[in-house]
Amino acid sequence: MRVAQMLMVTSSALMLSGCMQQPNTTKGSSQGEGPIKIELNQLLPQESQGTAAKEGKGMVFEVGYGKNGVGCIGSTFEEGVTPLGTFKVNAIMSKDRFEMDESLIQQSGKTKNYLSENLFNNMNSIDFKGDGETGEYGSGYISLTPVPSTPQPFNFNEYDGTYRWYSFAIHGTNDETRIGKRVTGGCINMKNKQLNKLIKNINLGDEVIVTSNQPCNR
């Protein structure tokens, strides 16, 4: 961890050009090899990276983060700000996998089957920037909720007539030149190929720790 912050990420979030979500309780990493660790470099964003255990070996991956900087532990999610702290995985979505905490399924007002068949595709079909581009979440979406939980602005709702959900998350991208930059709506983005590997090796309740080499700015 680095000096200014081992900040255990708190907040479930990311919206529009970024992401978002909702809170839950804590539980140790089911990987049995420690948490996923993400360190944001505010001086050199291109050196921001994450580490995770994969089949007994270390996996290292590049990440991008919020265009408006880094939020303090325990803060409420703001557009464009990536929160620091400790989080747990409360939803995993991709073409081949759908898992979500039961409390979120109940909150959605939909059945698990409906969410499994529609939610990620709906979320990924939205043109957030109005430029005709979709697929901003890339190949998958790992939702994170802060530990301990704090109030967050994440809801299931409609955006331009499309049923969706938003939260703080790790997700893929439709433009890999955005990785290693401060460009997201608050979420952490990574290359799709690496995200696919990560999704195969995580479970609900796994721990994610987000830190920074500089103090939070919000």
Segments from the language model and where they lie:
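Short Gly/aromatic-enriched secondary-structure transition segments
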Residues: 55-68, 102-107
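Short polybasic amphipathic segments
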Residues: 34-54
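Repetitive helical segments and hydrophobic/amphipathic motifs
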Residues: 11-14
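N-terminal post-signal-peptidase region of extra-cytosolic proteins
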Residues: 28, 32-37, 61-82, 87, ...
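Bacterial N-terminal signal peptides that target proteins for export
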Residues: 1-7
